[in-house]
Structures are given as structure tokens and as C-alpha cells.
């Protein structure tokens, strides 16, 4: 497949030691060579790097001192010729280099276009392409491992095997229908067809069983920290994040907005939301923060309720317990370094079967126990090995759910005595749905939509 030559800045914009301009396409080497003062890039070997300067042809002025990497097709990310110009990381210099390359008839790449070309040129499938973005956005080592496994094609191979099984079953059905007189072909009975379809259904179910943990590793657990003002919510956030992000004072109501931060808890990414203290208040700004806190609490996957060990429970405390019924929550009884005034029996009663953790955040006590409780709640204390294949992408989960339904429809039809040839419709639809995961049976509009979500230069 032939495309025009494209270029984009592949590194994050801003001041830094190095910036990279990536160029891909049939004419990439020749067009960069026009503005490169050094070796003749068209004559150098593949996968080599060369020192030189980028020159403005209009003024013959040296613009940048660079190192240029040459990678020749097909052994490149896009399976096209690729040039990467390594220059200094200032905004002006890297943009000037890009503009000089574009002036040679190169087009500015669209977001995700390099990865899109890798897909369209057959180097990776669609699920592997999506994993590239997951790797970039990974918040923990575990999330990174999930993305790498998908990039290496582990999910693709699982899906490929299932599609092959369905295809072989369809071929077997077809032969039985078209050539019933062949004695050397096994008869496709209802029993055999149910066995084959059930096996596919079970394999789809196994993959889907990893989706809850996979989605958590990919997207994180939305975790709201709630409680009355000055019970230690911001201190808890800072203890988990291990930096002073929130304002911690003795003045009630100092957290007037919602503060968010990602934190790695035993390999699980938590999207922590420190909310304004929930209480009745006349302060308009604080009221807005309180309302947003209630909204965040309703949307959270996990709620951490913080109460004060050194004060009796209030009606506001008890109202929080009632508000989180039906959600996953953990109770943190903070400030155990102060004299006890809270009734722990009442806390346990309000918490029902949920975990209650005592902490003294000022003395850094109880945080490890809290982290273990979170891991226990969502991963039963352990996370599978790095070699485990998870399905974490919402698009993949949706397609697998559809495939489970259509293969289930096929099994139900067989059990109800529907003619075997009629069952082909559901089997074929299952095969097509699974193909959408890897991009084998996907519409061009969806491809464009998926890659438009990528960052520029990737």
C-alpha cells in the first residue's frame, strides 16, 4: 500500500534536551537529505545514525545541529522508510526543523497516523495498535505489562484461534450441506456442533472474566475520599501520593474544590479524588465544592470514608455511611494519636461487612494496611502474573460480549432443533464480531475514529 510522505514532532512539546521529528514515506530519506548537511543520507545503510546540520535552503543558514536516524522499509514501525531527526528540545528549533521538512513537499501527519500506517501496512493488527496508546497512558507497571502483552499480539492470537475454530466449523457444515454423499467427511451432527460452539463460548467467557481487573489496570479505580471537614482527607491523599498536593491545615473547609491524582497501590492505579468536606455551610464557594463532592462520590468505584477518632460520630458522619450503601467502600478512622472519643462499635455497625482501618496519618500509621485492603477488595489480595492476558479495552469488551451472545444464540438454535444450515448465520456473525477486535472485519470509519484519539507524532 502506497501513501504520501508525512512528518510530525514525536516528542512532547516544551523545553528539553532532545526533540525528535519523525518522517515516514517512500520519499522520506530523499526529502530530508535535501536540507541535511553531512553524509548523503540516500547512500547510507539502514538503521544507522548520522551527525550533521539542518540548513535553510532559502538563506543557506544552518538552523540546527542534529543526529539523523535512517531506517529503511520494511523493517520499520510503519513498514515505510523512516527518518528521525534528533535536535535540541527548544520549541523554536524543533518547529523550524519541522517547517523546513514540510517545505520539501512533506505533509503534516494527522494524530496517530504513523501507527495507522503500521496497521494498514500489516505490521500490527488493530488491537495491537490500540495497545500502543495504552502503553503511553499506563499509570503502573502492571498496566504497562498488560499493554505490552497486547502489543506483542497475545490477545490477537487468542482471538485468531477462536476465529479459526469457527471458520473450520463453518467449512465442515458447508461440506455436509453441499456434498452429503462424501463418505470420508465426518457428519456434522447437532451434538458435534454444540460441542464446538460451546467450546468457543467457554473461551470467550474466560477472556471476559479478565475484563474487570483488566479495565481497572487500564483506567484505574475512581476513588473518592469523603468525610467532614478537617478529618484528614487531604492528609490521606498526600500519604498515598507521597507529595504535598492538597492544602493541609487545621481550618475546616480549606479544600474547596475536587483534587484528583493518580497513585500506584500495589500495582493497581487509583484515580484519587479528594473532595471538599461535606457539611452544611453558608460559604457559596464551599457549597459548590460540597455539591461536586457528592457528584464525585456517586460516580466513584471506591469510596474511602474518613472519620475522626478524637471526636464522637456526628449526624453528618452517619449520613455519609447511608449515602454509600450499595457501593464498595472502606472506612478510615483517622487521628488515633489523639484521645479516643469515637464509638468504634457504632463505626463497625455502620460499616456493615466493610473494612474499617485505623490510622494516624500524622504519624504515618495505617497506610500500608489501607493499601492492602484496597488490593484485597479488587484483586482478592493478588494480581495475576505479568504473563496474564487481560482484556481491558472497552471496545474489545463490548465486542466480546456481543460475540458471547451470538454464539449463545447459535447453541440455543441447535438445541431447539433448528436446521444446521440456519445456524451458520449466528456462527458467521460471531466470526465477524471477533474480527472487529483485530481489525480483520472493521469499517474504515471506525479505523479513522480510533486513530484520531492518538497523540500527534505517534
From Swiss-Prot:
Domain of life: Bacteria
UniProt-listed Enzyme Commission number(s): 3.6.-.-
Binding residues for K(+): 230, 249, 251, 254
Requisite cofactors: K(+)
Chain positions recorded as (6S)-5-formyl-5,6,7,8-tetrahydrofolate binding sites: 22, 84, 123, 458
SUPFAM superfamilies: P-loop containing nucleoside triphosphate hydrolases, TrmE connector domain
Predominant place of localization: cytoplasm
GO cellular component, one term: cytosol
Keywords: Cytoplasm, GTP-binding, Hydrolase, Magnesium, Metal-binding, Nucleotide-binding, Potassium, tRNA processing
Sites where the protein binds Mg(2+): 234, 255
Domain TrmE-type G: 220-379
Gene3D superfamilies tied to this protein: P-loop containing nucleotide triphosphate hydrolases, Probable tRNA modification gtpase trme, domain 1, tRNA modification GTPase MnmE domain 2
PANTHER family: TRNA MODIFICATION GTPASE GTPBP3, TRNA MODIFICATION GTPASE GTPBP3, MITOCHONDRIAL
Assembly with partners or alone: Homodimer. Heterotetramer of two MnmE and two MnmG subunits.
NCBIfam families: mnmE_trmE_thdF, PRK05291.1-3, small_GTP
Function in brief: Exhibits a very high intrinsic GTPase hydrolysis rate. Involved in the addition of a carboxymethylaminomethyl (cmnm) group at the wobble position (U34) of certain tRNAs, forming tRNA-cmnm(5)s(2)U34.
This protein's name: tRNA modification GTPase MnmE
Native organism: Bacillus cytotoxicus (strain DSM 22905 / CIP 110041 / 391-98 / NVH 391-98)
Upper lineage: Bacteria, Bacillati, Bacillota, Bacilli, Bacillales
Gene: mnmE
